[in-house]
């Protein structure tokens, strides 16, 4: 009984929300200042004289977002030379060779970087000893199982050099990937060596570096293409052989594993005579243990990608999509007070939202929309007659450089100005 009462309460609450929310088109064109995408979608597109109406809707929206009642009256514009000089000095824009100003859209670039960072995972894997001497084994974490695009991959090795080394200043360190069989063709410019190991394995040179042998320090070896091949083959294990022919001559040595770990694997349970005070050295060597640093992300077409890209209207689809619409400030006579950019991408959303599209992952606007659609599809009152709408699901900011009524140059960053993607509410 309490469950039925709770269900009835939720339905009543949702009914109140729906009744109190304005329906599309109930306010005529008054929605233009706050939602240009909604206003443009309601205007007729197939009427020859509809273009001016769409431009007027865009004008009202821009003025509203800049908190202006009307366009500034620029009676005596600042001389072009003075304007360009001020822009260069203040670093608010970039002046091209043709004299046009390109505004530096910092917020847009920052938003793109933040989105990319959110989609990128960083995994650090410490080395274990390999099956043979001077070999390392890396087992990439299961966290990376869904990652298929390598942004960066590096192996970090510590070169330990004695203080008395004076014989050689440089040594060459090479990294070879060990495989049972070389699969697929090698990328252009890569070098490969096939060396028989028990008649089964082969080796491929994946990184090489000439390093300074006069001081103890970390050295970084890029292995992005190697890890990319590994992920493409659906593998997570990497076996590496380290070669440094000149290291013995200089007395330098690569710390491939800490002493404690090496002793365990070689079965040396007892300490040798004279090693009683070596605990500090062992701990220090453990801190120099090799590791693999991997930065990777999911591919664009991954089935479990966090967010699907919205559709672009191309005339071939009639479901919810983004329609491109560009307004040039020069064409509408606004380039006298708007310095940059040269126009506005007034994209809008249009198309149908059938029941199998509305409320699905990637097209749903919110959890509330999904719940409403769940009841609507099952014919539950009061949602049976409600229809899904094609609305913006992702917007991006826009920077503008313009004159105000006092001939002052203003730079303003406006949030949620350009429609990037559309979906069904």
Curated annotation (Swiss-Prot):
It comes from the Eukaryota. Residues 1-20 form the signal peptide. Keywords: Cleavage on pair of basic residues, Disulfide bond, Glycoprotein, Growth factor, Hormone, Secreted, Signal. Residues 263-275 have a biased composition (Basic and acidic residues). One of its GO terms (cellular component) is activin A complex. Gene3D superfamilies: 2.60.120.970, Cystine-knot cytokines (2.10.90.10). Residues 21-309 form a propeptide. Coiled coil: none annotated. Disulfide bonds join 313-321, 320-390, 349-422, 353-424. Glycans are attached at residue 165. One of its GO terms (biological process) is hemoglobin biosynthetic process. Its main location: secreted. GO terms for molecular function: cytokine activity; growth factor activity; hormone activity. It is found in: Secreted. Residues 260-289 are annotated as: Disordered. Transmembrane segments: none annotated. Pfam families: TGF_beta, TGFb_propeptide. Dimeric, linked by one or more disulfide bonds. Inhibin A is a dimer of alpha/INHA and beta-A/INHBA. Activin A is a homodimer of beta-A/INHBA. Activin AB is a dimer of beta-A/INHBA and beta-B/INHBB. Interacts with FST and FSTL3; these interactions prevent activin A interaction to its type II receptor. Activin A interacts with ACVR2A. Activin A interacts with BMPR2. Inhibin A interacts with ACVR1; this interaction creates a non-signaling complex (NSC) that inhibits ACVR1-mediated BMP signaling. Inhibin A interacts with ACVR2A. Belongs to the TGF-beta family. Inhibins/activins are involved in regulating a number of diverse functions such as hypothalamic and pituitary hormone secretion, gonadal hormone secretion, germ cell development and maturation, erythroid differentiation, insulin secretion, nerve cell survival, embryonic axial development or bone growth, depending on their subunit composition. Activin A is a homodimer of INHBA that plays a role in several essential biological processes including embryonic development, stem cell maintenance and differentiation, haematopoiesis, cell proliferation and tissue fibrosis. Signals through type I (such as ACVR1B or ACVR1C) and type II receptors (such as ACVR2A, ACVR2B or BMPR2) which, upon ligand binding, phosphorylate SMAD2 and SMAD3 intracellular signaling mediators that form a complex with SMAD4, translocate to the nucleus and modulate gene expression. This is Inhibin beta A chain.
